[in-house]
Every structure is written in C-alpha cells, then in structure tokens.
Amino acid sequence: MGVAKLTDQNTLVPDSKYAHVERERRYLLEDLPEGLTRAEHHLQITDNYITGTRLRIRKVRDPRTNKWVVKFTQKFAPNPNDFSRTIITNTYLSAIEAEMLSMFNANEIRKNRYKFEFGGRTFSIDMFLGDLFGLVLAETGFESDEEMANFPLPAFAHS
C-alpha cells in the first residue's frame, strides 16, 4: 500500500470561520478619477503571488508612518468562470515570518492604492507600477449578490 498523495481532486477546502466571501467589481480607468491626485494619501502595496498556488504575500506600507502590515492570503474563485466572488482567508505575519516565506518563487505586482468616495461608495483605486505601469483599476465591494448585480457602471470608469 503506497502513501496517499494530495491532489486537487482529493483535497477539499471546507467552509471556514476564518474565510469569507468577497464580492467585488473592478473597473478599468484611464487615470485617477477627477478630484484625486497622486499626491494624496495612498498605501504602497507589494503582492508576491507564489508560483503554482492560490497564495500571496501582501506587504502594505503607509508612507505617512512608514509602518508595514504583512498578510499571507489564500484567495480563489469557487466558480472559475466568475471572479466577482472569491473566498479569501488572511493571516497576519511578523517580519520574520514574511522573510521565511520569501524563499518561494513568486510573481511580484506593485501598486499604489488610493481611497476614493463616489456616489456614496468607497472605491479602491490602484495605480500599478513596474511591468504593469500605466494600468489603473478601481474596485468596490458589496454585501450581497443582489447589490452587486444592480450596481451601475460608475461615471469615471470604462465599460
């Protein structure tokens, strides 16, 4: 009798009190929305997506305080055809834990994240850096599928 091996087919991801559903819409922008400038407060985010997994290490720096938050995240879409709903689990890491996990091969994405209020909602506006320089995305979250389905395209976004 051989040793049982883990595969995607025989490994379950059970419901967890630590994981939650994220409902988000993302929109492509040409630039920052009118009224928001690069000089405004933002967070500097570095995401390292561990090759071959659904895992990332996210480092978030507030340039006003020079303080960091580091999260180890699993994020996946239960329906591979619908990325508007994802299951996300975060674990906060110490600097030593983050350094230990940095040994894994990963694809890095860097961006500056701005908060933007529009139409009674808060949007995160991401301006990408490095290889994705010039890409600007807006995202906003929803409490329910119905709220998400009925939300109109914001005036500052492309269809």
Residue ranges, per PLM feature:
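Phosphate-end processing signature that detects enzymes handling 5′-triphosphorylated RNA
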Residues: 2-159
